[in-house]
Design a protein with these regions (language model features):
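Active-site-proximal loop/helix segment associated with metal-binding centers of metalloenzymes
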Residues: 148-152, 160, 168-204, 249-254
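Active-site metal-binding motif and surrounding structural segment of the metallo-beta-lactamase
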Residues: 44, 55-102
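Structural motif
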Residues: 45-47, 75, 137, 161-164, ...
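Conserved beta-strand hairpin/beta-sheet module of binuclear metal-dependent hydrolase folds
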Residues: 4-66, 154-157, 161-165, 269
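Short acidic active-site motifs
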Residues: 88, 296-301
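Metallo-beta-lactamase
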Residues: 5-9, 103-152, 208-211
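FMN-binding flavodoxin-like domain, especially the glycine-rich phosphate-binding loop
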Residues: 175, 186-226, 231-233, 275-291, ...
Length: 403
């Protein structure tokens, strides 16, 4: 059964929602599901913008058949070749043998690498700055390499001001009928997933996002809709969400606050983390988030690291090293290029306490533009009252560094 939504008078959402997939890219938990967005334009010529994951192909085909209502599909325009958006290309070609493909040189190379039989079809190769008309609608193409694949591009319908943004401005979460961001409480229900999406999907490539935003800045007044390949369509408050992407891709903190991530085997390091959180709140800093590194998926920790200005690493020493799950968190921060944060350290161990020095060395040597506070809380097995002064000094140092 078809499930479509009208975006503009001539444009329809023909994508699908997926609540069956547990791990996006087989890595990231998506308890709220995910959407695969595709769009169909009805003009003198008909155009399908991207396809969907193979698991949702039937839904796409039913949606497309309903919107076309007996018309032929004239063009398939492909902005991004990742299989969750391109897997149905060959099925579209089989069902619409006269369809013409529009994409760029690298995209056509990837189509052939994935084994799509496109050579029997007319392939129209475009590059940045080119325009193409489908009737009253004219589109122009903007390269978006490494946002987050090398072939990625975005397409602007200059007639209606619709930006087909590929994976940029996307988010985890299934739409379930609510296509537009203004139909949901985005800040309450979606922002965390958007922030979790960005660093893991495109966050390593912050400079490339900044380049795309710079390009978009020249036509920002023309953009009335943002149609990403995942998540809601934006038709209101576009500037608010663009500003979020700008903040995240510059690796600037979204808010002044403290993320406390602790690694605790028997609860003693956790107790110290709790004591620090309590002290910070007592001193007026209520924006404090605390997570057990062992029971929290690292993608959630990274999302919070992109949110907060200050990060406290509290780790027990394990085999004369950093606790393994904490080390994984550090490695992910490095891989995803997190920058411009202030760190504080709590270390613990019953003998040969090493975790603090090792965490500080990692932050200093492996991460970029980071500050580590001189104050450190060092514990021997557990936190006693004799350590209260050190803990309060650490809390004061964190708050002082925010001024």
């Amino acid at each position: 059964m078809y499930c479509v939504r009208k975006v503009t008078n001539d444009l329809y959402w023909v994508g699908a929602n997926d609540h069956r997939l547990a791990l996006f890219e087989n890595c990231f938990p998506i308890p709220r599901g995910v959407s695969y967005n595709a769009y169909c334009l009805l003009d003198e010529k008909t155009v399908l913008f991207d396809t969907v994951d193979w698991s949702a192909c039937r839904q796409l085909l039913e949606n497309l058949a309903y919107v076309l209502d007996g018309r032929e599909l004239d063009y398939l325009l492909v902005n991004h070749l990742e299989p969750d958006h391109a897997a149905c290309i060959e099925e579209i070609l089989l069902r619409h043998p006269k369809v013409k493909l529009i994409s760029n040189e690298k995209a056509f190379m990837l189509m052939r690498q994935f084994g799509f039989h496109v050579d029997g079809h007319e392939c129209i190769e475009v590059k940045e700055g080119d325009t193409f008309s489908f009737g009253k609608h004219t589109v122009t193409f903007v390269g978006a390499p490494m946002v987050h694949w090398p072939e990625a591009m975005v397409t602007l319908d200059v007639t209606d001001g619709v930006l087909f943004s590929a994976d940029a401005f996307g988010t985890f979460g299934a739409l379930d009928g609510k296509l537009f961001a203004d139909e949901v409480d985005f800040e309450r229900d979606w922002l965390d997933d958007a922030r979790r999406y960005l660093p893991h999907i495109v966050g390593q490539y912050g400079p490339h996002i900044q380049l795309l935003l710079k390009k978009a800045g020249g036509v920002l007044d023309q953009i009335k809709y943002i149609c990403p390949l995942h998540g809601p369509v934006w038709r209101k408050d576009l500037g608010w969400f663009i500003e979020k992407y700008d903040t995240w891709s510059r690796y600037a903190p979204e808010t002044q606050g403290v993320l406390i991530v602790y690694a605790s085997m028997y609860g003693n390091t956790e107790n110290a983390a709790q004591a620090l959180a309590t002290s910070l709140c007592d001193k007026g800093m209520s924006k404090v988030a605390m997570y057990d590194v062992s029971s929290t998926h690292v993608s959630q920790l990274i999302s919070e690291a992109f949110k907060y200005s200050h990060i406290v690493l509290a780790s027990v020493t394990y085999n004369l090293g950093i606790y393994p799950a904490m080390h994984d968190f550090l490695m992910d921060m490095k891989a995803l290029n997190l920058q411009n944060r202030t760190f504080a350290i709590i270390e613990n161990g019953s003998w040969a306490v090493k975790s603090g020095d090792l965490m500080q060395k990692f932050v200093n040597d492996e991460l970029k533009n980071m500050t580590v506070l001189n104050e450190r809380l060092s514990l021997a097995s557990s936190m006693g009252t004799d350590k209260r002064t050190e803990l309060e000094a650490l809390a004061d140092a964190i708050l002082e560094s925010m001024k």
